[in-house]
UniProtKB/Swiss-Prot annotation:
One of its GO terms (cellular component) is respiratory chain complex I. Its EC number is 7.1.1.2. It comes from Equus caballus. One of its GO terms (molecular function) is NADH dehydrogenase (ubiquinone) activity. This is NADH-ubiquinone oxidoreductase chain 2.
Length: 346
């Protein structure tokens, strides 16, 4: 793709998301979503082959359906309230349809069906954009309409997303699918606390983006797309493999790593505002995610696959250094001591 065209398309993706996040008018929000959708398709299809074509088509159809539902909810809300502002969703039917549309855009259960298939069919770089930047716009709208959302529907979606995100990733060998199911589970954690403490949801989103960005950059750096190819990186780049292990454990939510902080604060917030059953269920279901993270770390760093090379370390050219990677790894693993400073979120 021509660099100028690619830059223009990328800037349109960024502009579409920024329009959604900064607008208070429903029509402008819908236009921002459409700009973002039409511009992201060529990025997903950058490496043109039948797999990327299929993945892009699935993504387009899903997001177009979600946009249609969103416009329907906007019109119903307009008929009942007579205003285009995003301050409140006045009609319960409009609220349910709007929540479903945004859940489809985010990949929440039961609208999660497209996330693993689309992520698997595209490149690692496109997958990174899909699982991080593309979550910002719908989550910002959910954040703004959180007082109007039906709590029971949102909590049901959240719990099912954590369950499906853990269960779906158990027998996967493809790293992109594992990251997709991980994304579904993390979205579940975010939406579970959205009504009670929206600011905590945004904190969780920030830490999730940092951890996912770190993981994808490490996968790109080691050229790994499957658990088998990842297990061979120990011979080539042991430091990168160690960093992958630490980041995976952080994504699983193990203390004293950064990923433990949002889970801890979300469970604390839910315990304050609702019964003890919901946070207990969420913590138990999070063990499914932790299991496949631990299995991945075991196959990556604690097993040595047979190799025809007798040398422990393989000879290789000097790999390209990524300047952004060290600070991202630090933030993805060492933010837990900052937790007392975040007491303001209460």
């Amino acid at each position: 793709m021509n660099p100028l065209i690619f830059t223009t398309i990328l800037m349109t993706v960024l502009l579409g998301t920024m329009i959604v996040m900064m607008s208070s008018h429903w029509l402008m929000i819908w236009i921002g979503f459409e700009m973002n959708l039409l511009a992201i398709i060529p990025i997903l299809m950058k490496k043109y082959n039948p797999r990327t074509m299929e993945a892009s088509t699935k993504y387009f159809l899903t997001q177009a359906t979600a946009s249609m539902l969103l416009m329907m909810a906007i019109i119903i809300n307009l008929m009942h309230s007579g205003q285009w502002t995003i301050t409140k969703v006045f009609n319960p039917t409009a609220s349910i349809i709007m929540t479903s549309a945004l859940a489809m855009k985010l990949g929440l259960t039961p609208f999660h069906f497209w996330v693993p298939e689309v992520t698997q069919g595209i490149s690692l770089t496109s997958g990174l954009i899909l699982l991080t930047w593309q979550k910002l716009a719908p989550m910002s709208i959910l954040y703004q309409i959180s007082p109007s959302i039906n709590l029971n529907i949102l909590l049901t979606m959240a719990v099912l997303s954590i369950l499906v995100g853990g269960w779906g990733g158990l027998n996967q060998t493809q790293l992109r699918k594992i990251m997709a199911y991980s994304s579904i589970a993390h979205m579940g954690w975010m939406t579970a606390v959205l009504v009670y403490n929206p600011t905590l949801t945004m904190l969780n989103m920030l830490i999730y983006i940092m951890m996912t960005l770190t993981m994808f950059m490490l996968f790109i750096h080691s050229s790994s797309t499957t658990t088998l190819s990842l297990s061979h990186t120990w011979n080539k780049m042991p430091l990168t493999t160690t960093l992958i292990l630490i980041t995976l454990l952080s994504m699983g939510g193990l203390p004293p790593l950064s990923g433990f902080m949002p889970k801890w604060m979300i469970i604390q917030e839910l315990t304050k505002n609702s019964s003890i059953i919901l946070p207990t269920l969420m913590a138990i279901m999070a063990l499914l995610n932790l299991y496949f993270y631990m299995r991945l770390t075991y196959s990556t760093s604690l097993t040595m696959f047979p190799s025809t090379n007798n040398m422990k370390m393989k000879w290789q050219f000097e790999t390209k250094r990524i300047t952004l990677l060290p600070p991202l790894i630090v933030m993805s693993s060492l933010l837990l001591p900052l937790t007392p400073m975040l007491s303001i979120l209460d």
